[in-house]
Each structure stands twice: as C-alpha cells, then as structure tokens.
C-alpha cells in the first residue's frame, strides 16, 4: 500500500503521546485511541494506523483502510490507507482479522495526522503509540466464543462485495458475515453421541440443518410450534425422516426464546444470542459460546427435559432461581432459566445490582432495555463519573411516532413505561455518545 512521506513538523509545542488500547475477540481487534494534545492543534485531522505484519502473505506492514476521505464519497469511492485518509474516529476496528488469525500477534502503531488536505499531511511520529495485540483463539480455558460480523452497511462489506449482491456471491457473503459463527455447530456435533436442544426459530439451510442431517447420533429438539408455523415446522418435518430424531413441540408460552444444544455425553453446552436462522447467523449481530462443563450441561439437559412436556408458563416458572456458581476454566458461571413467577425480579435485579456495584466501568450490548430500574442503573453509572459505553439495536425519536392522540384533539394520556424509556434513551443519546444505536 502507498505510504505518505511524513513531513517534518514546524511546531515547537511539545506533543504528548497517543493513548491507545485494544479490545479483542477471536476475529476482531477494536482499537480505542485518543490524542489529548490534539485539542491544541486546529489542523489535527485524525489517525493513521499501521498494522504489522500486513494484510497479505509476506507483507511487512500495511495501513488500515478508510473510505471516508477529503472528497464526498460516492458509489465508486475506493478505500485509502489511513496515512492518506486519516481515521476521524476514536474507535476503529480491523476488519481484516479472520478466523485463521487466532493465536497470532499484531502490532498497531497509532499516529496523529495533521494538515489541511490530501496534499498537506504530516504524520506526528513523535506522538505515536504502538499497541501489541495477541488475538485469542476461539477456545480459551474451556470456553469457546464466536462473534459474527453482521455489518452489511460497513465499509468492510462494501470492499468485499458488489452492490447489489450477485446471486453467485451470496454464499461467500453469508460466510463473511457469519465470521466463523457457523463453525460452532460442527464443533458441538462433532464426536457427540447424543444432542438435546431447544430452538426458537430453525430455518437456516446453509449450515444448521445440513449439520443436523449429517449428525449420526441421537438428536432431540424442543421447538416452538404455533398455528400455521413456518419458522420451525418445515425444518422439523424435514428432520423427521432421520431415524434418530425426536421433535417435541412447545406451544404454551408467549415466546420460547431458547437456543441451546447439549452434548450430554461429553458435558458441553452450545448457547448464545443467535437464532438458528440465516439472519441470526449473518446479518443480525449475535454470538455463540460452547461451555465445556458437565455441571452446566446437566442443568441445560434438565431444562430441555422439562420443556419436552410443553408445561404451562406458571409450571415453567416454578422454582426459577440462580444456580450455584460453577467453575469453568478460569471463570465463575451461574445460570438462570426464565421465566420467573409473576412480579418476581430475582434475575434482573441481580444484573441491576452488579451494575450498581461496578467500580470503574460498565459496557453493555442489548436489543432494547424495557426495565426502568435497569436503565436508571446504567444512566447512574455515567452520572457518577464511571465509564459507560452501550450499544442498542436502535434508538428512535419518540416525537416522530405515528398516531399521537393529541394530534387528533383527544386528551393526552400518561405515556406508557416503554415510551418513557424510549424518551429517556433518545434524550440521553442526544446529550452524549455513551449509549448508541447499532447503526451509529
């Protein structure tokens, strides 16, 4: 990649170093960076980030790319190395970390860039900082972790694939977005003799159903079954031809949101946020874990056996409580199976207390907060001077909601709890950038 020639700075002001930190998963390096002295320089444009080794076999180093340059982007815009197109963010991820990079070490040198335009750029090398990053393997201390990319609108996806996406590229695009998440199914099924599971939606024909069909052991699945269901029943009918498959329908619940598989012989559990659907594995942000723990596997197996009988909601909630902590690798883990009895809050109040007891920071990622106590605890974290950084699926503007009663002359009603939460979130997102929508 081309490299800008660093100009000799004429400033006599002493420039302090960049502060930078890396956050990793098996397929991601996220860099958080700041240049405190940048506020003293009106011509501070952003950062150049040099990775070593680079992006191609034998490449010594290379700059991370950025599609946002000095000219307005269009559909033909090409990504440029960040020494020529400085990164104007304080968070940036290396989208070129792939599953095979697990266990490798990379150096990231973050350098402030000053100037007035594309032909006037100065890399302030005296202020640069190098971060040494060891990318973890998928399996670590008896816990395996997969995150998908789910970034269809990102610069990285645009670099990899055409728009609109040709049909011939769909499989490759799905694999790129899944980012290795699909490998979790082969990992839990491989070598297993008996699998017990509960599944909310089962529609993925790319990886999940073929893996089930190729499985030679006993397969018992509890699935959501409602009138005219098209999210599970077709798949269950397809699996019904397998000699060792047992399907148990679940109908007496509002949402059977379980998605887990248990290797009962080896004592392993696959679970996480991902539905077993094409969207859940690729375009929706999700994760999967495999816990190597006979103790945890026993609890999940008992849960699956309870659900097999299609119990009512009160019967399912009976006795709901946190398990005793169990040691998995270097971690302490406990589990709570919802729902709880009506008006009980044992599960979520435990989370609220953990937030309140945080000493320095709280980082969270969730679909949508609907509990006011939880939201208040999160807001208080920031108000009390601790670090708060959160990501939500979306943050809507409540003023743009349709069917506002006051518009038709009717007396306004007290807003619902959900509306009050949306108003608070929207106002907070306008006030600061500590809680963001996924599309930010």
Pin down the residues of each PLM region.
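N-terminal carbohydrate-binding/catalytic regions of secreted carbohydrate-active enzymes
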Residues: 185, 198-202
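Alpha-helical transmembrane segments and their helix-helix packing motifs
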Residues: 321-323
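Alpha-helical scaffold elements lining the catalytic groove of polysaccharide deacetylases
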Residues: 342-345
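PLD/PLD-like phosphodiesterase catalytic module centered on the HKD motif
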Residues: 2-178, 182, 186, 190-193, ...
């Amino acid at each position: 990649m081309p490299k800008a020639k660093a100009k000799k700075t004429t400033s006599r002001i002493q420039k302090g170093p960049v502060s930078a930190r890396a956050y990793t998963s098996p397929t991601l390096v996220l860099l958080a960076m700041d240049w405190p002295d940048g506020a003293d320089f009106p011509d501070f444009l952003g950062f150049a980030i040099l990775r070593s080794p680079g992006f191609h076999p034998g490449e010594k180093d290379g700059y991370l790319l950025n599609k946002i340059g000095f000219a307005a982007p269009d559909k033909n815009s090409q990504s440029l190395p960040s020494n020529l197109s400085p990164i104007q963010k304080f968070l940036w991820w290396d989208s070129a970390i792939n599953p095979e990079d697990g266990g490798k070490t990379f150096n990231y040198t973050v350098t402030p860039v000053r100037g007035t335009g594309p032909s006037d750029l100065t890399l302030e090398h005296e202020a640069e900082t190098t971060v040494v990053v060891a990318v973890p393997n998928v399996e670590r201390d008896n816990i395996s972790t997969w995150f998908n990319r789910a970034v269809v609108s990102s610069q990285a996806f645009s670099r990899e694939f055409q728009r609109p996406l040709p049909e011939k590229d769909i499989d490759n695009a799905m694999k790129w977005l899944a980012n290795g998440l699909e490998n979790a199914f082969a990992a839990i099924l491989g070598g297993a003799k008996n699998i017990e599971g509960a599944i909310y939606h089962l529609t993925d024909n790319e990886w999940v159903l073929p893996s089930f069909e190729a499985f030679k052991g006993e397969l018992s699945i509890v699935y959501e079954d409602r009138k005219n269901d098209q999210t599970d029943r077709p798949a269950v009918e397809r699996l019904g031809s397998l000699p060792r498959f047992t399907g148990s329908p679940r109908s007496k619940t509002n949402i059977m949101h379980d998605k887990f598989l248990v290797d009962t012989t080896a004592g392993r559990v696959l679970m996480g946020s991902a539905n077993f659907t094409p969207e859940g594995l690729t375009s929706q942000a999700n994760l999967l874990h495999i816990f190597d723990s006979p103790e945890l596997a026993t609890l999940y197996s008992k849960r699956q056996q309870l659900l097999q009988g299609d119990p009512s909601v009160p019967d399912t909630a009976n006795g709901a409580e946190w398990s005793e902590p169990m040691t998995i690798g270097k971690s302490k883990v406990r589990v709570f199976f919802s729902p709880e009895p009506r008006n009980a809050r044992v599960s979520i109040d435990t989370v609220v207390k953990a937030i309140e007891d945080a000493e320095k920071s709280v980082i969270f990622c969730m679909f949508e907060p609907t509990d006011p106590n939880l939201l208040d605890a999160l807001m208080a974290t920031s108000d009390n001077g601790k670090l708060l950084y959160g990501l939500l699926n979306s943050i809507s503007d409540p003023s743009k909601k349709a069917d506002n009663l006051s518009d038709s002359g009717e007396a306004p009603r007290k807003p619902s709890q959900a509306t009050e939460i949306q108003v608070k979130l929207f106002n907070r997102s306008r006030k600061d950038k500590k809680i963001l929508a996924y599309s930010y």
